[in-house]
Amino acid sequence: MINLFDNFDQGSQDLYQSLIFSGYDNRTVVINDNGFLPRNIISPYSFFANYYNEKTTKAKSFYQIQVPRFWEIKANGNYAEIFDGDQRRGKMNYFLPLAYHRIVETVEWFDRTGIIRSMDSYNCFGLRFAETIFDKTGRAVLKSYFNQFGQEIIVENFQTGNI
């Protein structure tokens, strides 16, 4: 038997812990990997990426994210924003259980009109493991997943439903 979850949100975590405490230590699979899954839980991404970490690397804090030269990062306890002069060009969302450390989960990149055009997703090792591309209305169109070497391994097309 396996435990199969769409997302590893609070409800899924509670059920998972209840099953473990009840003696049901089944293989657990999460469909939507946010990059911060516990090591004993797999996802389609982690399976196909065959990810391993030889070095002890840590998740990235907001100040470790690369931004274009002369752009500025303004951070607070909830999120960080990226500015090109006085124009907001990005937003860093923190991983909520570790928000007080300002650990980055996603970086949203905006066009000059303020519409989201792409989003980089970072994992617990500080690597960009996925990129989501948005159309001019801000709707997700394509998501690419990368292995630890930055090679594209999975592409999900939201318009056609193909992977």
Please place each PLM-identified region on the residue numbering.
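Glycine/tyrosine- and acidic-biased, solvent-exposed loop/turn segments at the edges of beta-strands
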Residues: 1-163
